[in-house]
Amino acid sequence: MENRITTLFGIRYPIIAGGMIWCSGWRLAAAVSDAGGLGLIGAGSMTPDLLREHIRKCRAATGKPFGVNVPLMYRYAEQIMQVVMEERVPAVFTSAGSPKTWTGQLHAAGCKVAHVVSSTKFALKSQEAGVDAVVAEGFEAGGHNGREETATMALVPQVRAAITIPLIAAGGIATGRGMLAAFALGAEGIQMGTRFALSEESSASDAFKRLCIGLEEGGTMLALKKIGPTRLIRNDFYTAVETAENRGASAEELKELLGHTPFQVLMGGLLGIAVGLAGAWLYA
């Protein structure tokens, strides 16, 4: 099929694999791009040197366009952006910050730019900043979510009515039926995170993948609103977080509770302790 998203990124299908930290390395990005979509490398858990390595391996593995997702609040964001521009990555998806800082520089380096938003207000600001496309992500998404808690079904048509640039829908989409629904709401492409996090090429542990595949409705909950709304699997760790929040734990206490557990889960297990849908702390 052909539309503004496929034309913008030079892809066959308007399907983007979200650049999730700890899950989206060069293997997953290359596989998605080879299949006709747009694979993204998740830079939010990488050092600049490691990202450069992933970019070069991805480019060697596929002749198709690919991209990098950069959370703008990441401590290495500036160095990561320098790597992205030096390597002339075809597409850059930004999130968790203002796109105004980098969009012009990325365009000058030949990169197409999309920004992830959770509200119409920030979609308009992104358009004003000059991005090429917007990803409207509803709060059904795994990992970090917007504070507005607007569902994809409500968010996408409102954003579509407000902006003129190409629109990508995200959050709770995992099948062709979900893609069809997103298009009916006005989207021209979709971004999926969890579905690709559970693929063979994902870096997440097999135990984590099996757990997520077995989830049913009600198996995930939104938590951690003091430090950034995050969708977590409903298990012992979620109960510990909920208990801490109910007693009024500070943001600092919640951060200490989190520690590095999500990384341990994704890479090796500890499934009874902590886990988030598509990984706690994943940018989907």
State the predicted function of each range:
Residues 20, 172-173:
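Active-site metal-binding loops of divalent metal-dependent hydrolases
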